[in-house]
A protein has these predicted regions:
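Structural motif
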Residues: 30, 48, 107, 132-134, ...
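Active-site-proximal loop/helix segment associated with metal-binding centers of metalloenzymes
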Residues: 89-102, 113, 117-118, 133-138, ...
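Conserved G/P- and acidic residue-centered "switch" motifs that form tight phosphate/ATP-binding loops
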Residues: 35
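C-terminal regulatory/interaction regions
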Residues: 7, 190, 214, 219-331
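Binuclear metal-ion centers of metallo-dependent hydrolases, dominated by the metallo-beta-lactamase
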Residues: 6, 128, 142-225, 297-331
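His/Asp/Glu-rich metal-coordinating catalytic cores
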Residues: 1-26, 30, 38-174, 179, ...
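Short internal beta-strands
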Residues: 47-57, 135, 195-205, 255, ...
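Short, well-ordered alpha-helical microsegments
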Residues: 41, 95, 117-118, 181-185, ...
Length: 331
């Protein structure tokens, strides 16, 4: 199957006429968006795209103006040169793996995925159909990455926030505004009705989308300095050195990301706690997903160190290679 790079982070399949997370070249039939994170969402805000219902709502909340054709999970849509089906990817709300069947064979593009899935997503489901070519993200494609059970990490989040508040401090949880923030809020909702949260202003419209799809985010409001005392603050790591965070009296900071497992990276944020909750596959989940799909060829994307995972895949008998894509991710 012929794969061509499309934009900074996407692909085009000329034999199928389908673009994935990238612009549509002349002569193409459709653009499919795997999920609403900025490195996968359309840069052309007027472009016509296909996506899951939740991804459609999220990219609209982030300013997409063009038509979005909403596709249900496991629904197959036919185009002149290909049939396309979406499967839930478990990464964030709306995230989809994209299965394409054309005269050149079948391909599963995972986008960003996670199994076990995020409880704030629609789940994780592999197609019950052949996969000749698997294009899978390998953001954490090294054996040093093995995640703790989600519930254990959610309990750490709740304990961190409770303990900070009990000590008269303000718990600040650093994580990406879309996906991770809502998962942290969902975890804190289980701390009880007394747990109140503020979220960075850019995350508020995204929280409303999550709630419209039935996700429980507990008690929350957009960030407001005057009413922050007694509440937890959820804000991106990029704000850690801004006045918003630096001026909080008695702040207690947790970095919530798969990258929190790297203390050297996390120490740059002067965090008091490191909670390695990721919305990606760890190394062992990556290998297991490849085994379950059993493709003729595996393509690794978004990996800073592809050679290690490629070596392990080759040892298991897989034909495999890496694809050069930019990696822009908060873990």
């Amino acid at each position: 199957m012929n794969l061509q790079k499309s934009g900074f982070h996407g692909f085009y399949l000329p034999d199928a006429g389908i673009a994935l997370d990238g612009p549509l070249p002349d002569g193409g039939d459709a653009v499919f968006i795997s999920h609403a994170h900025a490195d996968h969402a359309p840069r052309n805000r007027d472009a016509e795209v296909y996506a899951s219902a939740a991804t459609a709502a999220l990219i609209r909340a982030r300013g997409h103006k063009g038509p979005v054709n909403e596709i249900s999970f496991t629904e197959t849509v036919s185009f002149p040169r290909a049939d396309v089906t979406l499967y839930p990817a478990g990464h964030i709300l709306g995230s989809a793996m994209i299965h394409i069947v054309s005269d050149s064979g079948s391909m599963l593009y995972t986008g960003d995925c996670r199994t076990p899935p995020s409880p704030t997503s629609e789940g994780f489901e592999l197609p019950d159909a052949p996969v000749d070519h698997l294009v899978i993200e390998a953001t954490f494609g090294l054996p040093i990455y093995k995640w703790a059970p989600h519930e254990q990490l959610f309990a750490q989040i709740r304990d961190f926030a409770r303990n900070a508040l009990n000590d008269g401090a303000t718990p600040v949880l650093l994580c990406y505004n879309l996906g991770k923030a809502q998962e942290v809020m969902h975890a804190l909702a289980d701390a009880g009705p007394e747990m109140a949260v503020q979220i960075h202003g850019a995350g508020a419209p995204l929280c409303r989308v999550y709630q419209s799809f039935g996700i429980n985010l507990g008690r929350w409001e957009p960030y407001r300095k005057s009413s922050l005392p007694g509440k937890a603050l959820i804000t991106p790591a990029s704000t850690a050195d801004t006045a918003m965070v630096q001026n909080i009296r008695n702040a207690r900071i947790a970095y919530v990301s798969g990258w929190a497992s790297l203390e050297a990276r996390a120490s740059q944020l002067l965090a008091d706690a490191l909670i390695p909750l990721s919305d990606h596959l760890d190394f062992f989940e990556l290998l297991d997903t490849c085994r379950k799909c059993n493709p003729g060829h595996v393509y690794l994307t978004h990996s800073p160190n592809p050679d290690v995972a490629l070596h392990f895949l080759e040892q298991e008998g897989f034909s495999c290679s890496s694809l050069d894509l930019e990696m822009i991710d908060d873990g």
